[in-house]
């Protein structure tokens, strides 16, 4: 059995890692909690104090430890070098991240293992009661994160003034979001998976306008349900989703320090006019369906399960010919 150690399940990384955990029938342990010795360990870590302090102790206690990390900018915080230096090989969920790490930290070995996003049918009865006669745009994520540009999505929605349309925001923040905006509905708090599946089923067009994404799990989930998905072309989303509604990005510098982001780092500058264009086109044509078989193939559980098992020499199965190893 593999033990997966990560942050709280309230976080995006926690939810990401837990999907691997469920795929392999492993145990999820939150950083700081105890676990049995001589186990195989899969970490999802960031280069911050609690992780950098804990990893040497975890390695001493365990049979084998592998580590995944993620990034969203052209250059990353120098402390990533400390994290990468603790392992002979680091795992990342995208080629975008792999290239960033290998360019900034020459000699780094990176293996790409894509995110696992299971496709589970939505509940038969709707949870939220979204009006069936409205066209509904939606977004799931930390809506107060500057990287997500959610206020620009709201601005686009208000500027378009589309009759019988709604914008639903599922906020995954640690604080309540209380914005009062006409036609914009905000859902706070941690929801069970069944409710999230219902949200995808009840809404129509997923909108992401991020300056960058290490993966973009909300958009990937929407694609699995064959929703029209608006994404940006900077970062990892195009590695998971092929959509005709892909917004072109220029480049811009970050203007202020925020967590691991530092002023002067570079990420995407998505085209606002394209956001308006794509939202209006989806609405005008009442686009409810977009085939995303390619996304399903990318996040296939059988392949990803085998790739993780190989990391720990479980049954010594060879990596499949489709495995993304670089």
PLM regions and their residue ranges:
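Acidic anion/phosphate-binding donor-loop and adjacent secondary structure
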Residues: 78-79, 116-134
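Extended catalytic core of nucleotide-activated donor transferases of GT-like folds
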Residues: 27-102, 194-195
């Amino acid at each position: 059995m593999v033990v997966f150690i990560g942050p709280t399940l309230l976080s995006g990384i926690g939810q990401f890692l837990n999907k691997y955990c469920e795929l392999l029938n492993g145990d999820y342990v939150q950083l700081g909690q105890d676990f049995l010795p001589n186990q195989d360990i899969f970490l999802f870590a960031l280069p911050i104090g609690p992780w950098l302090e804990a990893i040497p102790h975890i390695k001493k206690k365990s049979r084998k430890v592998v580590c995944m990390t993620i990034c969203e900018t052209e250059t990353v915080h120098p402390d990533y070098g400390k994290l990468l230096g603790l392992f002979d090989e680091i795992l990342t969920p995208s080629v975008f991240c792999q290239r960033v790490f290998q360019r900034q930290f020459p000699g780094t070995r990176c293996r790409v293992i894509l995110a696992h996003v299971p496709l589970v049918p939505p509940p038969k009865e709707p949870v939220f009661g979204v009006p069936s006669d409205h066209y509904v745009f939606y977004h799931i994520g930390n809506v107060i994160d500057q990287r997500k540009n959610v206020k620009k999505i709201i601005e686009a929605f208000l500027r378009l003034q589309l009759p019988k349309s709604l914008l639903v925001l599922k906020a995954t923040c640690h604080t309540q979001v209380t914005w009062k905006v006409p036609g914009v509905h905000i859902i706070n708090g941690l929801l069970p998976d069944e409710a999230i599946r219902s949200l995808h089923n009840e809404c129509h067009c997923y909108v992401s306008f991020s300056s960058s994404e290490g993966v973009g799990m909300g958009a990937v989930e929407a694609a699995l349900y064959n929703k029209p998905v608006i994404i940006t072309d900077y970062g990892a989303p195009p590695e998971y989703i092929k959509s005709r509604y892909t917004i072109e990005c220029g480049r811009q510098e970050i203007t202020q320090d925020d967590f691991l982001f530092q002023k002067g780092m570079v990420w995407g500058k998505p085209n606002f006019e394209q956001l308006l264009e794509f939202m209006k086109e989806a609405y005008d044509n009442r686009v409810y369906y977009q085939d995303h078989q390619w996304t399903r193939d990318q996040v296939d559980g059988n392949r990803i399960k085998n790739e993780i098992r190989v990391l720990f020499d479980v049954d010594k199965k060879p990596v499949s010919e489709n495995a993304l190893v670089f």
